[in-house]
Amino acid sequence: RTGRPAAPTPVLLEMAGDIESALTSIKRVSRDLKRGYKENEVLAIAALHSLSSVPIPKAISKIQSLLSGHQIQLRSGNQSACFQRLMTEEVSLMLAYETPVNTLEIPKDLVIKTQVTNDLLVPVCSPQQLEYISNVTPGSDQIQIVTYPENIFLGQQVHQELIAKSSHNFTQKLRAEMTSAIVSSTQVGLGMAWLPLSSIEDELKHGLLKFIDSPCFPIHELTVSMLRLRTKKMEKLASVCNALAVELEKTIQDAYKVLERSRVKL
């Protein structure tokens, strides 16, 4: 050991600025690499509330072995908000509903769209209301209904394709954007509702909601579509997306089986 304190040499003092710049560059590169690594781990999905509440989590639970090292971010919203998130690359994958007359127009050079399966908007009510609804003559009493607003996709389908074409008279009891709120409101008897089958599988299975099996209350078919960005990241995740689509189809088809078992003829 020496009694003299260490001191930078003249050469080191001259290079101090260059050394500091080099260290700053190294830190920046390290930070960018870490951020890029984290981004590669995340699969961000946008979906309608009705899809993100029940069927998508069920499907994700079946492909966990493929998700090792990946984190799922599930963003819920209405159809237009989800599509905007996809096109601004806030998410890389979108799951949505379509019908033959209500399709999502996509830029095909940026987005790949595939059909996953079909879902159904089915008429349901609480067990206590089933007998009342069975005795309502078309065009007579007002039937209380719980539904979506008309300015969102599912609301448009219910109001334009089902209520407007029905021989029954309806009175709006409650309106909600969230499928879960409509499920709860219908379950406690605020009114009947048309709800996505995939969202109410458990309620039908356990008798908390009853399917209204009548020509006066038709079923409306929906196509479940998957939209994914044409990026290198999504190319690497193609097997994950394909597996998710397969399991989502199985999940929704399981709900069809529950519907068949729950039919109560009016």
What are these regions (language model features)?
Residues 7-37:
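Alpha-helical "hinge/linker" immediately C-terminal to small N-terminal DNA-binding modules
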Residues 78-82, 87-90, 97, 151-153, ...:
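Hydrophobic hinge/microswitch elements
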Residues 107-150:
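Flexible hinge/capping segments at coil-to-helix
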Residues 130-134, 141-166, 241-245, 249-259:
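Secondary-structure junction motif
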